[in-house]
């Protein structure tokens, strides 16, 4: 009950605005103020690259829409980048209203809030004509914000590598009182664990890659072979596969499918 699988609206801005307003109304209408709750808000504007003209003014010059026919390796990405920034700006305004609603209800004092994304957007940073997402596993497409608000904790910035699958172990062990080892239910670790990662996996069940060390990208192709790139998406020839690390990664990837 209360789970919405679709949001009405003709545009991404209309849908994102409705998502924020529905959440605010839900917070204001809560009868049992002490009852724990979980909410998931998904904003789509930075994915859609679409805005009404009157909302596309904050960062200039900006494209009116994402004209993919004009993308090439030699173009200036600024107008496309500014369109993206304007979509983020509009969602930032909506997030401000969401946080203000939580403050008004006194919920910022006892609610963990996580702000992140499911992927990033690339704007040809590596000058290999990659744009948007879902075309490679470089940091420009998989690196996202990870911002936590935890009541009672001092603000702190971490610069070590984390992953989305660190979220559940952190919540379970640090805040929900789960005692058993995190390996029982997750590939992740605590967000605050600065131990260097020898590898991690990114992607989905069918389309994924292994990030080995700091900058080696081992991408599984549709044929089942591995293509290897460095951090700037330059193909790596004669790559010596670290067999032990790769074997461990494959076992971890499959162990929850028993």
Whereabouts are the PLM-identified features?
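A long, amphipathic alpha-helix that forms part
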Residues: 20-28, 64-111
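Active-site-proximal alpha/beta segments of enzymes that process anionic O-linked groups
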Residues: 1-67
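Histidine-centered active-site microenvironments of extracellular/periplasmic hydrolases
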Residues: 103, 107-151
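A short beta-strand-to-alpha-helix junction
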Residues: 14, 78-90, 136-142, 153-169, ...
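Beta-strand elements within well-structured catalytic alpha/beta cores of enzymes
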Residues: 36-44, 88-91, 95-98, 111-120, ...
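Membrane-interface soluble catalytic domains
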Residues: 103-106, 150-258
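Short catalytic/ligand-binding loop motif for oxyanion handling, primarily in non-cytosolic enzymes
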Residues: 46-52, 121-125, 219-220
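Loop/turn elements at helix/coil->beta-strand transitions in domains of secreted/extracellular proteins
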Residues: 32-39, 107-113, 212-216
């Amino acid at each position: 009950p209360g789970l919405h699988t679709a949001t009405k609206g003709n545009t991404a801005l209309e849908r994102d605005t409705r998502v924020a307003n529905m959440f605010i109304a839900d917070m204001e209408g809560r009868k049992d103020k002490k009852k724990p709750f979980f909410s998931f808000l998904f904003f789509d504007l930075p994915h859609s690259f679409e805005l009404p003209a009157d909302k596309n003014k904050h960062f200039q010059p900006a494209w009116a829409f994402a004209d993919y026919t004009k993308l090439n390796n030699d173009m200036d990405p600024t107008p496309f980048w500014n369109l993206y920034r304007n979509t983020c700006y509009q969602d930032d305004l909506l997030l401000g209203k969401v946080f203000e609603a939580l403050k008004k209800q006194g919920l910022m004092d006892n609610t963990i809030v996580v702000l992140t994304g499911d992927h990033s957007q690339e704007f040809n940073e590596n000058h290999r004509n990659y744009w948007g997402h879902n075309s490679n596993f470089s940091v420009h497409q998989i690196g996202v914000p990870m911002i936590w608000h935890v009541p009672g904790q001092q603000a702190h910035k971490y610069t070590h590598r984390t992953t989305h699958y660190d979220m559940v172990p952190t919540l379970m062990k640090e805040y929900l009182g789960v005692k058993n080892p995190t390996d029982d239910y997750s590939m992740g670790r605590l967000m605050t664990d600065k131990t260097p990662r020898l590898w991690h996996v990114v992607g989905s069940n069918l389309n994924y890659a292994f990030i080995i060390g700091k900058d080696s990208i081992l991408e599984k192709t549709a044929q089942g072979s591995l293509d290897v790139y460095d951090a700037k998406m330059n193909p790596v020839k004669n790559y010596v596969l670290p067999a032990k690390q790769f074997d461990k990664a494959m076992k971890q990837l499959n162990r929850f499918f028993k």
